[in-house]
């Protein structure tokens, strides 16, 4: 496929936080002919911003293309594993591994676990941008009836925070308000969800969560 792309994977993603989402130009290929396996690869060469429909050269910074490949294998309905890699030309290499596992406990009750890990390596340290980073998160959710109770932990390591431009990071504490991705940052989440189908109102749901963080390298982010 060649043309406009709205990529949605752990290493290439678009942002729809505004009325006009950003998009990319490039080419890609996907395949799901093997039962349980989805694979994809692509190269993004141009991008638009959310406040401008015109396109600029380069998927990230000027003249920097982004090449990615990876996929997800579902062993069964309860267990899947994802592996992805990406190269931002003359900028960074990034690798991702993720796993999602649901353990049925009883009728209507299950325990869901999600693990995500990113490793980003600087490809050209001469430009002054530090991007070396390892980011990991673990979330556990108890689903019982129409209720869900979850906790999550996320941690950053390396010489910098997690570098991102647009869209969602596939980490538990990356939310619309903040990604909690500063250098050395550790963050903790508590979450509750309710499905109002339990009150006879299907399609209506409620979610609340609290996230706090610590250990940020304030010298790196420029905070006194």
Place the predicted regions along the sequence by residue.
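Residues that define the transmembrane beta-barrel architecture of outer-membrane proteins
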Residues: 21-25, 63-67, 91-95, 132-136, ...
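Transmembrane beta-strand segments that form the barrel wall of outer-membrane beta-barrel proteins
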Residues: 2-14, 39-45, 69, 77-89, ...
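Repeated loop/turn-to-beta-strand initiation elements of outer-membrane beta-barrel proteins
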Residues: 1, 36-40, 48, 77-82, ...
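Outer-membrane beta-barrel domain signature
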Residues: 13-18, 52-62, 70, 84-89, ...
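Residues on the lipid-exposed face of transmembrane beta-strands in outer-membrane beta-barrel proteins
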Residues: 27-31, 69-73, 97-101, 138-144, ...
């Amino acid at each position: 496929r060649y043309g406009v792309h709205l990529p949605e994977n752990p290493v290439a993603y678009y942002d729809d936080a505004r009325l006009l989402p950003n998009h990319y130009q490039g080419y890609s290929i996907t395949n799901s002919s093997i039962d349980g396996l989805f694979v994809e690869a692509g190269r993004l060469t141009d991008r638009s911003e959310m406040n401008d429909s015109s396109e600029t050269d380069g998927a990230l910074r000027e003249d920097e293309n982004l090449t990615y490949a990876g996929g997800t294998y579902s062993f069964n309905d309860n267990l899947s594993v994802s592996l992805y890699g990406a190269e931002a030309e003359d900028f960074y290499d990034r690798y991702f591994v993720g796993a999602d596992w649901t353990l049925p406990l009883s009728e209507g009750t299950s325990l869901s676990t999600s693990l995500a890990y990113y490793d980003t390596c600087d490809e050209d340290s001469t430009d002054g941008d530090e991007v070396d980073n390892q980011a990991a998160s673990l979330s556990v959710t108890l689903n019982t009836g129409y209720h869900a109770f979850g906790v999550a932990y996320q941690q950053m390591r390396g010489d910098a925070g997690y570098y991102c431009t647009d869209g969602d990071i596939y980490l538990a504490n990356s939310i619309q308000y903040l990604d909690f991705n500063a250098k050395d940052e550790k963050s903790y989440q508590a979450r509750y969800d309710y499905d109002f189908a339990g009150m006879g109102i299907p399609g209506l749901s409620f979610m609340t969560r609290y996230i706090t963080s610590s250990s940020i390298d304030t010298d790196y982010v420029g905070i006194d």
